[in-house]
Amino acid sequence: MTANPQVTIAIRAAHLRYRKNIGRHAAWQYAKSRGCPMGVYRLACQLTVLQDAGYP
C-alpha cells in the first residue's frame, strides 16, 4: 500500500495545528473531513491521523 506523499504531508501538517485540541472521536471526524478515500486506503488515512494524535 503506497500512500500519496503529498496527501500524507498535508494531513500531518494540518493535523499538527489541531493536535492539542483533538480527541479520539474528533480525530476520526477530522480524517473523514480530510477527504480520505473509501475502503482500505481510508482506513490507512484515518490510522495515520490517529497516530499523529498520539493513539496506538
Which ranges hold each PLM region?
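Short, Lys/Arg-enriched anionic-surface-contact patches
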Residues: 2-7
